Amino acid sequence: MIINNLEEIKDKFFFAIIIGSGPAGISTALGLEEKKIESLIIEAGELNYTSKNTPYLKGTYVGDPDYSTLAGSRGRQFGGTGNLWGGNCNPIQEEEFENWPIKKIDLDKYIGRAKKILNLKNKFVLEKFNNNLDLYNRDWSDVKFGNKYFNHFKKSKYINLSLNTIYQGSDGDNGKITSINCFKKKNYKLKSKYFILSCGGIENSRLLLWTKNNNPKLFKYDLPIGNYYMDHPFHRVAEGLVNYKKLQSYNKKNNVKNAPLITCDSTYNLSCNKDFIKAKKIINSGLYIGFENANKYDSIFKQVRCMAPNFVKKIYEDKTVKDTYKVKVNILQEQEPLFSRKITLNKNSDPLGIPLPEAHWWKTELERKSARVITEEIVKFFLKNDIARIGIEEYLFNRDEYDTQAGYHQLGGTRMGSNTKDSVVDKNLKVHGTSNLFINGSSVFRTGSYNHPTYTIVKLALRLSNHLAKI
């Protein structure tokens, strides 16, 4: 049901009020709906994005210049960034949950429902590629959350949606929220049994920090709100030439069953296994090896000839140009969770007086080292097996500044855990020391992984809805 006027519900007591209508908020409401439990979603934006919302999305980055804006990476509309994302999905692997208060099996029971929400059709695979690297795949979702779910919400008996409704703080003390303050043409107080903050990786920290500043009596502990902020830096690490027929031969000989046919999927996805990560003292990443058609006049042949003349000579002599492809190796990096990388409140405010966020973010030398070690591993493997010759970018071997593209996977800030010193929410996503405040979305990730987050966000949201239905 669409709520156009809050006068209709100002005296109603809901089971759950969900603040934010991105993938996390929508998935939680859908999970509650399955159990015939009523919820209210309040969304600060409209059905579609309008420029008048841009001042609310502004903020600043402190640190590396790669990430110069916050407004372009967030969405204030029904569906949130679920209308902006690229659709890539893959799961966090079992060993990556090592420091989380939950395990992979705790989310596996929600695989079917998450795939339905995201329209995912393919099976996720992870298999050994060589002694140190694993091959994995990504599935692609065509879902734009606003488009897919607005009519569903409009007809629902259990999901209420109020657009243009801005959260302005919480009433209560001693860990219990009694009502939240909202603005929709005028101020309202809305009541519920449970309150779920689902506003995205940066906005969750921003609103929770602001709530704490305005109502410190609500919180029992001095929680690290905003700390351990992470992203997924994406950058080019190498390029060269590969003999695809030899790569196929290696896969067949070594029983690599799920390697993609480049006529269907032009990218190999590789990551490190846990033994290699531990031995090299690095953090993991996803290597994207992209194949492109090549011809003998491409400049890449001249570049590779300089470092591997015999390899190129053999291509011409054996007339295997048709089997030779250009490869560009990109990396999507996990970041170590650091207390000093954080979301704070800026001195500037949005049009309603709520402080804008400030993201303190930078790349570390451990991340450079990790990118170098992982890239060297695949380059050495290709050389040893005479499959390819690939040159590595120089910046991985020195301390020069280097650019990365924004991953726009804003992670951490309200991370989960059992210790109030290094986490904000518990294993059930309840804020430590509170009885009815929960947080949902990528901000609860304890570590960043190298995987795209939305699939895990949806599973966590479904798990939260199941938990709320039981307590």
Language-model features: where?
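A glycine-rich dinucleotide-binding beta-alpha-beta segment and adjacent secondary-structure elements
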Residues: S162-D173, T324-Q335, S340, L352-T447, ...
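Conserved redox-cofactor binding core of oxidoreductases
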Residues: I102-S179, E401-A406
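Glycine-rich loop(s) and the adjacent beta-strand/alpha-helix scaffold that form part
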Residues: E34, L47, F183-N254, G441, ...
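N-terminal Rossmann-like FAD-binding beta1-loop-alpha1 element of flavoenzymes
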Residues: F14-I41
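Short, solvent-exposed loop/turn and secondary-structure capping segments
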Residues: T50-N53, T81, G87, S205-T211
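FAD cofactor-binding and catalytic pocket of flavoenzymes
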Residues: T60-Y61, D222-M230, F234-P355, Q410, ...
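Redox-cofactor-proximal catalytic regions of oxidoreductases
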Residues: K58-V125, F339-K347
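Extreme N-terminal leader/targeting segments of oxidoreductases
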Residues: M1-A16, E34-K35, K470
